[in-house]
Amino acid sequence: FIQPVRGEKKLHFTYTKNKNDSSNGFFCKTKAENNYLKFAKNSSEKIILNDQIRTFRIAISSTGEYTSYWGDGDDSNGSNQEDALAAVVSTLNRVNAIFEQDLNIRLELISDISLLYEDKNTDPFNGNFASELQTTLDTEIGDAGYDLGHLFDFGEPNGDAGCVGCVCVSNKKGQGFSTHPFIDIYGGTYRNDYFDLDYVGHEIGHQFGAYHTYSYDYEPYGYSSEPGSGSTIMAYAGITGEDDLQQHGDPYFHYHSIKNILNYVESISCGSFTSIETQAFDIDAGPDYNIPVGTAYELNFKPIEDEGAYTYSWEQLDSAEITSDNFGPYNLTGAMARSILPSKISNRLIPN
């Protein structure tokens, strides 16, 4: 993917996803009790994306700190606001790549540089980001002019969606924010998508109805199915200390997150639809098997024809508190296997 180079109008980084550098730990303040969903217990069921992309209008604003960070102070080659807009578009493109792939959801930027504030002393944001952003968007754009809103900020790692499931909900849809220092812990050039996915993608996931999937700190909603910190977008990879599976999240949603989000968007009527070509198929899981406790096993699936077009991931859906202290093959509840980045390999060895 592509990311603008700070202070360089004509240069961009182009690179693939990697885990070689790191940034400071992220803390998500989203409270699941602030949800606008009818709570449903965890259950496994077939999820089939339809043959339409659903587009939602997103308004993105920024603090003066964010705009100043990405601006080079040279108006002869574009204003700081235009520099910040390039960074905003880069982040949104990365988020869209995952949302379109996993969810058939596209986010369309409908705000312009007028909402990318240049001066931290005069911008409308003074620390109460959720309420301040909601007021700003409703005043500048109007409630009917956007489906969800998000604020980008420069500072210590932080984030909050303001809710779980509030896209298109008046007085709630414009309260998400993500804050990042745009550095890595080794002091090198910031050159990764951690802000895009660990922060923005995570909080927008909440706005679309996704709950946390980690299990190091149990949440009573039935979705604590990734051991420890977890590793997908709605988990907490890299910020749970001894329970961390890895430093940062992988660029995909867990089954639970996909189900949460698709259930939510089916419950609302906003957004526009664009038809796409897709191929639906049925998968037969075959008969159930009982194996002795503690036995290694292999999950196998006959690849679908045109194998190159599909990737596969095996995920466990049991929900319970699982930490580094109690993780193991003898638990009666909770995750005994982590989620692994989807690949073209259709089988999975447990443990691996």
Language-model features, listed with the residues they occupy:
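Fold-level signature of zinc-dependent metallopeptidase catalytic domains
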Residues: 11-167
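Soluble non-cytosolic domains of exported or imported proteins
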Residues: 78-90, 191-195, 199, 252-255
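Exoplasmic/lumenal beta-rich domain surfaces
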Residues: 108, 313-352
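The catalytic-center signature of Zn2+-dependent metalloproteases
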Residues: 110-131, 170-252
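Proline/serine/threonine-rich low-complexity linkers at boundaries of modular beta-sandwich domains
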Residues: 264-282
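Proline-centered linker/hinge motifs at extracellular inter-domain junctions
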Residues: 278-287, 325
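Acidic, Ser/Thr
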Residues: 300-307, 317
